């Protein structure tokens, strides 16, 4: 099985919260696509609660679009990581990490402004696969934890696992 890019970086050295360019590629028409790792939690030490990450998923995508789309950037998708330590964001364009970090912080401020669970988009049986698994309070706790800390930049070069280590791990 091919080794995915996300498994070639050393998760024991990742900082959080932090932005990392996880992958860049071009479409057949030459459009740049960038995938960002938005790491909310230190891997293997912190994890977002399932109700909070689910609510954040509903809020974060719209708020990030409000703050990041434009000037050659259009978000395709923002999805939570299965490990519940962050989100992957795929977009058209190549914004730098600081622009992404600034938009992320602004989006977290927006999460804190939501006053009632009824304001969560698509929170109904028709548009959400587990519409009862939400917590605005947990989502706002996550947002506060991001805003209380500096959003850093994780570098692929600094986090790259040496080839010897990958071989040792039988990858």
UniProtKB/Swiss-Prot annotation:
Its EC number is 4.4.1.21. One of its GO terms (biological process) is quorum sensing. Fe cation binds at residues 54, 58, 128. The keyword Metal-binding applies. The gene is luxS. GO terms for molecular function: iron ion binding; S-ribosylhomocysteine lyase activity. HAMAP family: LuxS (MF_00091). It comes from the Bacteria. The keyword Iron applies. Involved in the synthesis of autoinducer 2 (AI-2) which is secreted by bacteria and is used to communicate both the cell density and the metabolic potential of the environment. The regulation of gene expression in response to changes in cell density is called quorum sensing. Catalyzes the transformation of S-ribosylhomocysteine (RHC) to homocysteine (HC) and 4,5-dihydroxy-2,3-pentadione (DPD). Its cofactor is Fe cation. It is an enzyme of class 4 (lyase). This is S-ribosylhomocysteine lyase. Binds 1 Fe cation per subunit. Belongs to the LuxS family. It comes from Shigella flexneri. It holds the Pfam family LuxS. Homodimer. Keywords: Autoinducer synthesis, Iron, Lyase, Metal-binding, Quorum sensing. It catalyses: S-(5-deoxy-D-ribos-5-yl)-L-homocysteine = (S)-4,5-dihydroxypentane-2,3-dione + L-homocysteine.
């Amino acid at each position: 099985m091919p080794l995915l890019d996300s498994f070639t970086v050393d998760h024991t050295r990742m900082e959080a919260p932090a932005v990392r360019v996880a992958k860049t590629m071009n479409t057949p028409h030459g459009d740049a696509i960038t995938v960002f790792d938005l790491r909310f939690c230190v891997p293997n030490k912190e994890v977002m609660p399932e109700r909070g990450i689910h609510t954040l998923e509903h809020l974060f995508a719209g708020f990030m679009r409000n703050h990041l789309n434009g000037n050659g950037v259009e978000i395709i998708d923002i999805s939570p990581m299965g490990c519940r330590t962050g989100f992957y964001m795929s977009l058209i364009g190549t914004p730098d990490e600081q622009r992404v970090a600034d938009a992320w912080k602004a989006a977290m401020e927006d999460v804190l402004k939501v006053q009632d669970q009824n304001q969560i988009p698509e929170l109904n049986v028709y548009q959400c696969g587990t519409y009862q698994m939400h917590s605005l309070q947990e989502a706002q706790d996550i947002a506060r934890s991001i805003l209380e800390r500096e959003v850093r930049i994780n570098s692929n070069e600094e986090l790259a696992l040496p080839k010897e280590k990958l071989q040792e791990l039988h990858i």
